[in-house]
């Protein structure tokens, strides 16, 4: 039975998240319905990242085992046809070894959080960025963000319902980049805690507004208490940008 790796983009706005839910539509559910429409079987689609409700993906990765053999391009095109009108696109399909696991084979996950730092209302990017009308000091944000790099206990930035066994994670990258009114917060790690990225972003916005400084952010991290966290950024601006596996070309971001 061949195993297929799928690279997927989606607008998370209409979904209750990646993972199948009984109380609303999910990205996983839509993909599994599309696979069933093609092959007639119930097939589980396993994702590399279980994005929350409203969170988007530029290149989510998933795998599934299908009894029938498909040429990768035909599988991709068939899935896209059956996914309409959902805002989901299968960018690529490829046959991979049975040992490949979208989640457990991943070496690094890259997320981008987009902020529109402007007074004007959003017209085009509603639901796809976080509009922050007050000016942000992005240099201060970037400098403070470096305090979070490395291996730490991220309990402060962990949702109270997070089911991870350990609060320790290793953060490889956390950059804040401004391009006009557009601010991007780029982060990379092997894995994250539930709501970790949005919690870090919200706290960095407090730094950008001058409510916190870098020492305050370090103190929040050291407190290891959820109550010490700043606000949690909304899901609108968060994107799963890429998932790296063995042999992936490193993703470079120049400030």
Swiss-Prot record:
Keyword presence, tRNA processing: yes
Any GO molecular function: tRNA pseudouridine(38-40) synthase activity
Keyword tRNA processing: yes
Keywords, ordered alphabetically: Isomerase, tRNA processing
EC category name: isomerase
One Pfam family in the UniProt entry: PseudoU_synth_1
InterPro entries the UniProt entry points to: PsdUridine_synth_cat_dom_sf (IPR020103), PsdUridine_synth_TruA (IPR001406), PsdUridine_synth_TruA_a/b_dom (IPR020097), PsdUridine_synth_TruA_C (IPR020095), TruA/RsuA/RluB/E/F_N (IPR020094)
Catalytic residue list: 52
UniProt-recorded name of the protein: tRNA pseudouridine synthase A
Species name: Nitrobacter winogradskyi (strain ATCC 25391 / DSM 10237 / CIP 104748 / NCIMB 11846 / Nb-255)
């Amino acid at each position: 039975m061949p195993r297929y790796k799928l690279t997927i983009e989606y607008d998370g706005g209409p979904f209750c998240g990646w993972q199948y839910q009984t109380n609303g539509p999910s990205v996983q559910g839509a993909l599994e319905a599309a696979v069933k429409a093609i092959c007639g079987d119930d097939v589980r689609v396993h994702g590399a990242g279980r994005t929350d409700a409203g969170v988007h993906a530029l290149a989510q990765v998933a795998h599934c085992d299908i009894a029938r053999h498909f040429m990768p391009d035909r599988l991709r095109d068939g899935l896209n046809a059956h996914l309409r009108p959902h805002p989901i696109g299968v960018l690529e399909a490829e046959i991979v070894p049975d040992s490949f696991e979208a989640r457990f084979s991943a070496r690094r996950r890259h997320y981008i959080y987009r902020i529109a730092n402007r007074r004007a209302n959003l017209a085009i990017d509603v639901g796809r960025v976080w509009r922050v009308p007050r000016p942000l000091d992005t240099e201060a944000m970037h400098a403070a963000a470096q305090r979070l790099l490395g291996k730490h206990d991220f309990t402060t930035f962990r949702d109270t319902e997070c089911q991870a066994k350990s609060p320790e994670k290793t953060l490889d990258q956390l950059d804040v980049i401004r391009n006009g009114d557009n601010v991007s917060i780029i982060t990379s790690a092997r894995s994250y805690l539930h709501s970790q990225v949005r919690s870090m972003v919200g706290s960095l916005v407090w730094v950008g507004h001058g409510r916190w400084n870098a020492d305050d952010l370090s103190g929040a991290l050291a407190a290891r208490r959820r109550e010490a966290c700043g606000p949690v950024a909304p899901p609108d601006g968060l994107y799963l940008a890429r998932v790296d596996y063995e042999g992936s070309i490193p993703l470079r971001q120049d400030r």
